[in-house]
Amino acid sequence: MKLTCVLIIAVLFLTACQLATAKTYSKGRQKHRALRSTDKNIKLTRRCTPDDGACAEPVQCCSTFCNPVTNMCIDWLGIGLSRSVL
């Protein structure tokens, strides 16, 4: 009888500990897998500025060059290749 009570209390204690730790680890995470996959897709897509658009750094331009004088994206190769092709 004492052993049964000890086992029941131990199981309840371990279950409570497991639920408490599972709750703290899941904070800030989304519950639905579909939402998680769309968040990853949004983070992976990179928006860039087309030719003749304003820029401050070369990485912002879809083309290969940001003119530091005019702060405009230009295709310095003159053949219309974007970064994804290069």
Swiss-Prot record:
<feature type="disulfide bond">
    <location>
        <begin position="55"/>
        <end position="66"/>
    </location>
</feature>
<feature type="propeptide">
    <location>
        <begin position="23"/>
        <end position="45"/>
    </location>
</feature>
<keyword id="KW-0800">Toxin</keyword>
<protein>
    <recommendedName>
        <fullName>Conotoxin S6.10</fullName>
    </recommendedName>
</protein>
<feature type="signal peptide">
    <location>
        <begin position="1"/>
        <end position="22"/>
    </location>
</feature>
<feature type="disulfide bond">
    <location>
        <begin position="61"/>
        <end position="73"/>
    </location>
</feature>
<comment type="similarity">
    <text>Belongs to the conotoxin O1 superfamily.</text>
</comment>
<dbReference type="GO" id="GO:0090729">
    <property type="term" value="F:toxin activity"/>
</dbReference>
<keyword id="KW-0732">Signal</keyword>
<dbReference type="Pfam" id="PF02950">
    <property type="entry name" value="Conotoxin"/>
</dbReference>
<dbReference type="GO" id="GO:0008200">
    <property type="term" value="F:ion channel inhibitor activity"/>
</dbReference>
<keyword id="KW-0964">Secreted</keyword>
<keyword id="KW-0960">Knottin</keyword>
<feature type="disulfide bond">
    <location>
        <begin position="48"/>
        <end position="62"/>
    </location>
</feature>
<dbReference type="GO" id="GO:0005576">
    <property type="term" value="C:extracellular region"/>
</dbReference>
<keyword id="KW-0165">Cleavage on pair of basic residues</keyword>
<keyword id="KW-1015">Disulfide bond</keyword>
<dbReference type="InterPro" id="IPR004214">
    <property type="entry name" value="Conotoxin"/>
</dbReference>
